[in-house]
Amino acid sequence: IRRELDVRYGRGEILVFGEPWAADETAIEGTAVPALKKHIAQLDCEIGMFCDDTRDAIKGHVFEAEIPGFVNGANGLEEKILNSVRAWSTDGRNVKAPSQVITYVSAHDNWTLWDKLEKTISDEEERIRINKMAAAMYMTCQGNLFFLSGEEFARTKDGLENTYNAPIELNRLDWERAYRYTDLRTYYQGLIALRKQLPGLCDKSEGAWKRIFEEWKTEGVVGFFVDNTG
C-alpha cells in the first residue's frame, strides 16, 4: 500500500500512521511483517505509529490513574524523556527516523491530558502549570506533533476514559473553556510558533537524532541542545 501511494501521489504526499498494536491474531501469512510497534525499524520511513512510550513517560500510565509520569512526580524517567526528545530514533535501533513517530500525550482514547492530571493533582492552578510543562515537553521532541482537539483549553470528558458510546454533550468541544483557560490556550499557541522556528525538532529524516546533542540529566531534570542550522 505504501509503495502504491508513493507511485500515485508522490513520495511523502500521503502519510500512513496507525496504532502500533493488534487486538488479536491477524490473517497475515508467511514471512510478512505486521506493522506493530516492535517491527517499526523494519518498516518504510513513511509508515509510522503513535508513540505510547513518549505519552506514558510524560503524563503517566495510560490505564492506571494513580501512576504518574515525569511531569506529575514519577522518578527514574529521565532517560525515557531524552529518548522521547529524539523520537526514539538514536542509531536507528528502535525507530528508523522521526518520521515514523507521532509525538503526543492524549488522543481520542483514554483520559484526556487534563483528566489524567486531575487524578494526581487536585489543585487547579498547579494542574495548569503541569499541563503547560507536559505540552512544552512533547512539543520540543522530534517526531510528528499531534494533540487532541481541545487539549489546549483543558479538554475534559468528566474523568471518563473512553467515550465512543457517550452522548455528544460529553464528546463535544466546550468552547467556553477556550475563554476560561485563555492563558493555557495562548501558551500552546506560543509553543507551536516556537517549534516552527526550530528546524532541528522538525527534521524527520534518518539521522535527525544527531541534531540533539550534549544532553544531560539529573534527578527530575533533563537538558539538551538542538542544532537548528540548515
Which residues fall in each region the model found?
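Conserved alpha/beta catalytic core and glycan-binding cleft of carbohydrate-active enzymes
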Residues: 2, 13-149, 153-154, 199-202, ...
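Alpha-helix initiation and N-capping motif
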Residues: 78, 98, 110, 166, ...
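Short, functionally important structural connectors and interaction interfaces within domains
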Residues: 94-97, 165, 193
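Cytochrome P450 core scaffold surrounding the K-helix E-X-X-R motif
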Residues: 115, 158-163
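Catalytic cores of secreted or luminal carbohydrate-active enzymes
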Residues: 174-206
